Amino acid sequence: MKKQKIAVLGPGSWGTALAQVLNDNGHEVRIWGNIPEQIDEINEKHTNTRYFKDVILDENIKAYKELSEALDSVNAILFVVPTKVTRLVAKQVAELLDHKVVVMHASKGLEPGTHERLSTILEEEIPSEMRSEIVVVSGPSHAEETIVRDITLITAASKDLETARYVQGIFSNSYFRLYTNSDVIGVETAGALKNIIAVGAGALHGMGYGDNAKAAVITRGLAEITRLGVKLGADPLTYSGLSGVGDLIVTGTSIHSRNWRAGDALGRGEKLEDIERNMGMVIEGISTTKVAYEIAQELGVYMPITTAIYKSIYEGADIKESILNMMSNELRSENEWDKK
């Protein structure tokens, strides 16, 4: 593929890792961020020690403080900013863009208040001629592994499969491989909702429970993710793929996962405000829990794990008691995930 100019919006761990993948493939990569010291560090020392202590980035990766400079004559834009600021950044991008580009995002969450998926936010904010070609990049991936070029397989989802194949082409190489999918709703809901289940799995670990309990919360968590996703219009088969069960396994079992670590700390009795302060990173599963709970209540979707975590985080219920209470819920058929 011809060399592309790509703006990566967000110099966090995942944005930095994806920037390196694109750079390895010979593309011109421009990272944009709003922390001056971090941008200077990337340009001058070729490091991003806020997230990676021992990683040296390629000198060809450039970082920008001015969004207009990062966007100048690019072929594609990759949003990797926290969910809560995606709309704000998209508005800024829309004001500055003077040509058509491919718009991608690699964040996982649901917007508080509106309950919207990130591609919907982008559709509402970017120029109309680009709205049908938004691509979601999502799947089982720890930035800590991708940055050292461990094998990673994820999904590129778009209503327009030709654009999804373009994204597949700019990212794929010997250690990083993308598969295409047209089910944007399924891929996005899987990526957002698995963070809630990861909090639950981490909490079980923090409370001292073993593998049986963790396997139960992950598999039953997948059932309620699917239940809500299908209600929203997703294809249930998507949840058996990379962006579904694959991402849930990675996030729900690993110490690399900030959502799992947050749950682990909650399970050990730490206060949420202390956990967020100590981590110094966005824990998307916390805000997504509230959004998912509200959607489930509105649509009448049975989500017991999400409800238990919501009650412990937002209503002050004891997390151990909330989780154990699920054991006394009505007995159900495993195969009737789409029914109450």
Swiss-Prot record:
<feature type="binding site">
    <location>
        <position position="194"/>
    </location>
    <ligand>
        <name>sn-glycerol 3-phosphate</name>
    </ligand>
</feature>
<keyword id="KW-0443">Lipid metabolism</keyword>
<feature type="active site" description="Proton acceptor">
    <location>
        <position position="194"/>
    </location>
</feature>
<keyword id="KW-0594">Phospholipid biosynthesis</keyword>
<dbReference type="Pfam" id="PF01210">
    <property type="entry name" value="NAD_Gly3P_dh_N"/>
</dbReference>
<keyword id="KW-0560">Oxidoreductase</keyword>
<feature type="binding site">
    <location>
        <position position="13"/>
    </location>
    <ligand>
        <name>NADPH</name>
    </ligand>
</feature>
<feature type="binding site">
    <location>
        <position position="14"/>
    </location>
    <ligand>
        <name>NADPH</name>
    </ligand>
</feature>
<dbReference type="GO" id="GO:0006650">
    <property type="term" value="P:glycerophospholipid metabolic process"/>
</dbReference>
<feature type="binding site">
    <location>
        <position position="258"/>
    </location>
    <ligand>
        <name>NADPH</name>
    </ligand>
</feature>
<feature type="binding site">
    <location>
        <position position="108"/>
    </location>
    <ligand>
        <name>NADPH</name>
    </ligand>
</feature>
<keyword id="KW-0520">NAD</keyword>
<comment type="similarity">
    <text>Belongs to the NAD-dependent glycerol-3-phosphate dehydrogenase family.</text>
</comment>
<dbReference type="InterPro" id="IPR008927">
    <property type="entry name" value="6-PGluconate_DH-like_C_sf"/>
</dbReference>
<dbReference type="InterPro" id="IPR013328">
    <property type="entry name" value="6PGD_dom2"/>
</dbReference>
<dbReference type="GO" id="GO:0046167">
    <property type="term" value="P:glycerol-3-phosphate biosynthetic process"/>
</dbReference>
<keyword id="KW-0547">Nucleotide-binding</keyword>
<feature type="binding site">
    <location>
        <position position="258"/>
    </location>
    <ligand>
        <name>sn-glycerol 3-phosphate</name>
    </ligand>
</feature>
<dbReference type="InterPro" id="IPR006168">
    <property type="entry name" value="G3P_DH_NAD-dep"/>
</dbReference>
<dbReference type="GO" id="GO:0005829">
    <property type="term" value="C:cytosol"/>
</dbReference>
<dbReference type="Pfam" id="PF07479">
    <property type="entry name" value="NAD_Gly3P_dh_C"/>
</dbReference>
<feature type="binding site">
    <location>
        <position position="284"/>
    </location>
    <ligand>
        <name>NADPH</name>
    </ligand>
</feature>
<feature type="binding site">
    <location>
        <position position="141"/>
    </location>
    <ligand>
        <name>sn-glycerol 3-phosphate</name>
    </ligand>
</feature>
<dbReference type="GO" id="GO:0051287">
    <property type="term" value="F:NAD binding"/>
</dbReference>
<dbReference type="InterPro" id="IPR006109">
    <property type="entry name" value="G3P_DH_NAD-dep_C"/>
</dbReference>
<keyword id="KW-0444">Lipid biosynthesis</keyword>
<dbReference type="GO" id="GO:0008654">
    <property type="term" value="P:phospholipid biosynthetic process"/>
</dbReference>
<comment type="function">
    <text>Catalyzes the reduction of the glycolytic intermediate dihydroxyacetone phosphate (DHAP) to sn-glycerol 3-phosphate (G3P), the key precursor for phospholipid synthesis.</text>
</comment>
<feature type="binding site">
    <location>
        <position position="257"/>
    </location>
    <ligand>
        <name>sn-glycerol 3-phosphate</name>
    </ligand>
</feature>
<feature type="binding site">
    <location>
        <position position="247"/>
    </location>
    <ligand>
        <name>sn-glycerol 3-phosphate</name>
    </ligand>
</feature>
<dbReference type="GO" id="GO:0046168">
    <property type="term" value="P:glycerol-3-phosphate catabolic process"/>
</dbReference>
<keyword id="KW-1208">Phospholipid metabolism</keyword>
<dbReference type="GO" id="GO:0005975">
    <property type="term" value="P:carbohydrate metabolic process"/>
</dbReference>
<dbReference type="InterPro" id="IPR036291">
    <property type="entry name" value="NAD(P)-bd_dom_sf"/>
</dbReference>
<keyword id="KW-0963">Cytoplasm</keyword>
<feature type="binding site">
    <location>
        <position position="139"/>
    </location>
    <ligand>
        <name>sn-glycerol 3-phosphate</name>
    </ligand>
</feature>
<keyword id="KW-0521">NADP</keyword>
<feature type="binding site">
    <location>
        <position position="143"/>
    </location>
    <ligand>
        <name>NADPH</name>
    </ligand>
</feature>
<comment type="pathway">
    <text>Membrane lipid metabolism; glycerophospholipid metabolism.</text>
</comment>
<dbReference type="GO" id="GO:0047952">
    <property type="term" value="F:glycerol-3-phosphate dehydrogenase [NAD(P)+] activity"/>
</dbReference>
<protein>
    <recommendedName>
        <fullName>Glycerol-3-phosphate dehydrogenase [NAD(P)+]</fullName>
        <ecNumber>1.1.1.94</ecNumber>
    </recommendedName>
</protein>
<feature type="binding site">
    <location>
        <position position="282"/>
    </location>
    <ligand>
        <name>NADPH</name>
    </ligand>
</feature>
